């Protein structure tokens, strides 16, 4: 995982400093703490200058500083993981492998073929010296962040970067659409003093749409938010990338339609394991569930094994913890998504290695109001502040149980229950349940210093709530229970697994029930297709920036290409049944899988969004809508 940045100045009136500030360098460096390197490429006739700044988090193979440059003056940035499609040896670094393959490409079609073959998250920037071309883009789902800052004047500079700075003085910043990959002819841009982007869009291998329809739709989508002087054109050869997944199966059985019309108004409120057992008694259903478990298991396996384990640098940074440190952590609420991921990770992470379960809670509002007079919560806030700034915690008061009651939010309660279920599943594993407690004071401070820059350019109340919760959770600083005492702990894991993608594909949100009631299974299919289509702009770039800020890498098993293709191959009736009550009907196939894995309690837990389960949504304001612009993210 890396922090990458490229600034191109097309005229002497604009300098690199217009875009690359000390603050931006700091944010990039936090993403890649293991290596930092900069490079400037100056070209005359026509005149332009390129500045490259690369920062590496070393996770696989040999340490490879970025940017890479070859004998032909080509320059390459890679922020990604190759999980399949192109062979990467155990001792190889995928950045070098990709650069080597790019050097062998002799045409645009070769480059598209290479990127079409990749499986895994990526964003990249590639300067092709011979043609003065700058290529860049994100994977099909946009699992790695890439932003562009485009000048408001036609002869200006522009910037591509993993993360930006939320500043009034900055040029407008947007997420690079995950609609395909882009190419810029820098020689032409410098000559005409204008910016023009050539797009190579994604296309399903089998689709009813012809190229012209695809091109029109994608161009409209990409162009709508760009300044008027910036043009986006389709490549002249009408070349496309091959989408790494199959289209959504929209098949709806007659039985499903009849079931909706007769039973949708009679949904029972009773949630029971017997309901799930009834489904599993049907041979076809059970077979599909096991196929799903198998494909998801492979996705988790790739994500927990493809990382450098080498020599241990110490332990989990607390006395008395397992002598081996954790390399893998899970964003953990105890809900069915995170429970299944943790259980599957347990199959593949070496047994002697702990797994960190990161559980975040925000101080309940009632306690926040009383912090001026309530000794327990004042003392707790002081201890949390000490915990953030001090390395030596040996003398910390062990009698913290009473004080921590103000963090007993819903996700903390379900998280503890989930821990017990995992411990029963594998008592030989060290499960570090990390209780991450956040006060209002610390929330405001960390939002001001870091989080508002990472959420940017997104700006809604929902982005703020989710972004803050994920930032504190993935930081991994909290407490673990050792022999009945709460001990300070900081997770050393560099890989963070997250369950995002399950709700989007398996009708997990409450809005899906509303859609189903209004429009039936046809409407639900359209909604789910839209969910996955917009996940790059709504979720994944933001989450990558948030988690990457700690020098850690987000990995998304539910958005593995094989998992998505498998789920897309199934009709909606195999994945969810929204005539059933909450806690069963949504994400039905996942709940059935959880029961088969032995996670019975988790299998019938209703969906609870992180902003509600962690209680951040109630900490600062109760009168906001999720889609409102968040005033707390604005600069003052």
UniProtKB/Swiss-Prot annotation:
Keywords of this entry: Amino-acid biosynthesis, Asparagine biosynthesis, Glutamine amidotransferase
One Gene Ontology molecular-function label: asparagine synthase (glutamine-hydrolyzing) activity
Any one GO biological process: asparagine biosynthetic process
Coiled coil: none
Active site: 2
PROSITE patterns: GATASE_TYPE_2
Protein name from the UniProt record: Asparagine synthetase domain-containing protein 1
Transmembrane segments: none
Entry-linked InterPro entries: Asn_synthase (IPR001962), Asn_synthetase_domain (IPR051857), GATase_2_dom (IPR017932), Ntn_hydrolases_N (IPR029055), Rossmann-like_a/b/a_fold (IPR014729)
Species per Swiss-Prot/TrEMBL record: Gallus gallus (Chicken)
Residues annotated as domain Glutamine amidotransferase type-2: 2-187
Domain annotation Asparagine synthetase: ranges: 291-607
